[in-house]
């Protein structure tokens, strides 16, 4: 057995926080490829709803791979995966990409499944977005399954699972919290002075966000900041995609490197609360501003309050 086979044989499921922002997802994609991807993996299944960051993660894992659902390549026909027999000469495709949800508008599922298995049997690698939609038509599970919701799940299935439908359910149930947290995070940046926004670093927590300020504590009134954010949430102002580096909050431009990972409007942010004190991260010398979203946000706030013996509040 090869080294990669021995290394992966006991791996079932790993979990990461799904970062918000293009560069952080790229970095995580590189890390996942280095830790979990084997050169012998031929079928890679990626699962998650629109706006979850699947395509960005794939670009991080497979630099240089042409994604067939790109806005710039969406009209390129025929789909390379469906046109394998026309590839001649020395240089042929090694890795194919296919977005099943998109391609089902053009091609029957069983034809897509046949093309995927044909490529795999020819020793090619196929990266399949929305793998859960095509799995019932395939004769096999993926070598590596990746689910993107609030968390990123990396699974190496065996005959007993995990199966795509269970990964899909978990991602669908959790994605709304990631979208709410990202919108609340950008809303927080929107309401603080630009000089503080520009020096803030970003971290992730369950059902929430962290803005980390290095070296010194910002001069911010957190009670007032929460009131202003809640006022905008109550107004239910729209969150609009502008370009790959900006969104519009109520028509006002705001920088954002994950512009598609948002709720449609601020009114969709449920249960928002700020921790009313900065947490001091001794190890990295940073002051942490923590926000929580979701139905259990008060429970999370209470849990943080009980942790005062372990964390420094300032």
Residue ranges of model-derived segments:
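N-terminal pre-Walker A segment at the start of P-loop NTPase domains
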Residues: 2-39
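Walker A (P-loop) ATP-phosphate-binding motif of ABC ATPase nucleotide-binding domains
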Residues: 43
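Hydrophobic anchor at the beta1->P-loop junction of P-loop NTPases
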Residues: 46
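The conserved Walker
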Residues: 50
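A conserved segment at the C-terminal end of the G1
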Residues: 55-68
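Conserved nucleotide-sensing/catalytic segment adjacent to the nucleotide-binding pocket
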Residues: 69-132
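Active-/binding-site microenvironments in catalytic and ligand-binding cores
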Residues: 165-314
């Amino acid at each position: 057995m090869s080294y990669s086979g021995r290394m992966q044989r006991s791996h079932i499921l790993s979990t990461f926080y799904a970062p918000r922002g293009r560069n952080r997802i790229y970095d995580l994609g590189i890390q996942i490829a280095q830790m979990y991807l084997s050169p012998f993996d031929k079928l890679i299944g990626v699962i998650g709803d629109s706006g979850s960051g699947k395509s960005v993660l794939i670009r991080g894992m497979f630099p240089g791979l042409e994604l067939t659902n790109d806005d710039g390549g969406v009209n390129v026909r025929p789909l390379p995966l469906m046109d394998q027999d026309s590839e001649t000469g020395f240089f042929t495709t090694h890795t194919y990409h296919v977005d099943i949800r998109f391609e089902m508008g053009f091609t029957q599922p069983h034809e897509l499944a046949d093309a995927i298995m044909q490529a795999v049997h020819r020793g090619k690698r196929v990266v399949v977005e929305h793998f859960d939609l095509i799995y019932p038509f395939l004769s096999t599970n993926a070598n590596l399954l990746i689910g993107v919701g609030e968390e990123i799940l990396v699974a190496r299935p065996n005959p007993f699972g995990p199966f795509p439908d269970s990964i899909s359910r978990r991602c669908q149930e959790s994605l709304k919290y990631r979208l709410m947290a990202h919108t609340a995070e950008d809303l927080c940046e929107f309401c603080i002075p630009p000089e503080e926004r520009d020096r803030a670093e970003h971290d992730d927590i369950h059902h929430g966000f962290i803005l980390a300020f290095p070296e010194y504590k910002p001069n911010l009134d957190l009670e007032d900041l929460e009131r202003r954010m809640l006022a905008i949430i109550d107004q239910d102002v729209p969150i609009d995609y502008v370009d790959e580096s900006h969104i519009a909050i109520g028509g006002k431009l705001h920088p954002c490197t994950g512009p598609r990972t948002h709720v449609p409007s601020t009114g969709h942010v449920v249960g928002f609360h700020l921790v009313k004190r900065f947490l001091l991260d001794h190890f990295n010398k940073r002051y942490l501003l923590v926000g929580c979203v979701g139905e259990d946000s008060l429970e999370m706030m209470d849990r943080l309050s009980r942790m005062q013996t372990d964390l420094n509040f300032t």
